[in-house]
Amino acid sequence: MTNIRKSHALFKLINDALIDLPAPSNISSWWNFGSLLGICLLIQILTGLFLAMHYTSDTATAFQSVTHICRDVNYGWILRYLHANGASMFFICLFLHVGRGLYYGSYIYTETWNVGILLLFAVMATAFMGYVLPWGQMSFWGATVITNLLSAIPYIGTNLVEWIWGGFSVDKATLTRFFAFHFLLPFIISALVVVHLLFLHETGSNNPTGIPSDMDMIPFHPYYTIKDMLGALIMILALLLLVLFSPDLLGDPDNYIPANPLNTPPHIKPEWYFLFAYAILRSIPNKLGGVLALVLSILILALMPLLHTSKQRSMMFRPLSQCMFWLLVADLLTLTWIGGQPVEHPFIIIGQLASILYFLLILVLMPLVSIVENHLLKW
């Protein structure tokens, strides 16, 4: 008799995705981040669900309801901080996951890569709307600044912004709809994750060498289940250290001041994981130009398969491309730092140079260096 996990319609799906899935024998810990992102999503959905039971999406009571969760709800404080810092862990894993894909040429699997970009946009939208919900100063002004960017769209811009606001400013209607969408989007993300995995399992995983590994596969369980469990343990430990020892390390103190439309904070800035994009937005003096640069800073990832000029897939054996890649990482860290600084000299010029370098590296330098490497290898 066939094992139930191989014959039962539902168990067969799980078996083919998590147990008997053939995986390359040489994938490193950089391949752990997919499962870590799944765990992050699960943590966020569960903590978010319990927070939603006590939260009220009304401008008069939203801030107070978050205080109530932290003070009066049993273990409400840990739920709130797990959710807030869980988002940070989510983005750390996301950036490392995307970075891995860039380094090892995983973007050659175009469908998987494009669904991944959609996922990145969806997670960013969810995180932005979630940041508005506590209704602190940074929530309110962050929402005002970012939604206002849409007014840069010619002709329909102003109408579009007022339609999203549900009025003439960020107010009760905006908060209510943001809560509704913040609740809805993680389930859309979950559906996209299934599509992402579906496309991945069509082709099989890439590996550090970038060479097809069809002739050398091992079952996912027990080899990679145990490896993923180690990664999960390290990530959960890091999250708990953050939550239990310095829960406000990555937050903004201004968000402990209730939202006040009559008082603008001295420095409006988003959460740390958006700072690189915020720096690119600010480095262009023109509003529409800034918005386009902001969108393109993420959308440029969709061009990666077209910009791949190397005869090799992975950067493992390409030292010059590795230099370009790490220069890109350093540039993104610089942009993240600049995004958190006030708009004054010398930060303005540093931000502008870092923004130019970002697009220059991806669109010009990396493809050129790949061509040079091909010639060096006489290909």
Swiss-Prot record:
Annotated membrane topology: Multi-pass membrane protein
Residues annotated as binding a ubiquinone: 201
Keywords for the protein's UniProt record, in alphabetical order: Electron transport, Heme, Iron, Membrane, Metal-binding, Mitochondrion, Mitochondrion inner membrane, Respiratory chain, Transmembrane, Transmembrane helix, Transport, Ubiquinone
CDD domains, per database record: cytochrome_b_C, Cytochrome_b_N
GO-annotated cellular components: mitochondrial inner membrane; respiratory chain complex III
Compartmental location: Mitochondrion inner membrane
Quaternary state and interactors: The cytochrome bc1 complex contains 11 subunits: 3 respiratory subunits (MT-CYB, CYC1 and UQCRFS1), 2 core proteins (UQCRC1 and UQCRC2) and 6 low-molecular weight proteins (UQCRH/QCR6, UQCRB/QCR7, UQCRQ/QCR8, UQCR10/QCR9, UQCR11/QCR10 and a cleavage product of UQCRFS1). This cytochrome bc1 complex then forms a dimer.
More about this protein: Heme 1 (or BL or b562) is low-potential and absorbs at about 562 nm, and heme 2 (or BH or b566) is high-potential and absorbs at about 566 nm.
Protein name: Cytochrome b
Lineage: Eukaryota, Metazoa, Chordata, Craniata, Vertebrata
Gene expressing this chain: MT-CYB
